[in-house]
């Protein structure tokens, strides 16, 4: 299994330094959606990493694929959300509210 990355130049540079080769540097939501589609069509890719800000802009493209997509903060830090998506998933799956 390989890991694919879709991100801005700073994020992509970090993952390239870590040795990942399936990386897409994008500058627009359209480029990001196309990169996600290309990574999704590659059977060797099992995990796709992108930034939270890109993820918000291409939510429909991410929701339509079957691979695991992990959203990480970019250089501006994490996006503050009213509901933490991980807490919501745990609460729905287990019935326990994490504080």
From Swiss-Prot:
The answer to keyword Glycoprotein applying to this record is: no
Q: What is its main location?
A: membrane
User: A Pfam family matched by this chain, by name?
Assistant: ATP-synt_F
Name the species this protein comes from: Methanococcus maripaludis (strain DSM 14266 / JCM 13030 / NBRC 101832 / S2 / LL)
Q: What is this protein called?
A: A-type ATP synthase subunit F
GO cellular component terms, alphabetically, are: plasma membrane
Segment forming the signal sequence = none
Gene behind this protein: atpF
For this protein, the record's InterPro entries field holds: ATPase_V1-cplx_f_g_su (IPR008218), ATPase_V1-cplx_fsu_bac/arc (IPR022944), ATPase_V1_fsu_sf (IPR036906)
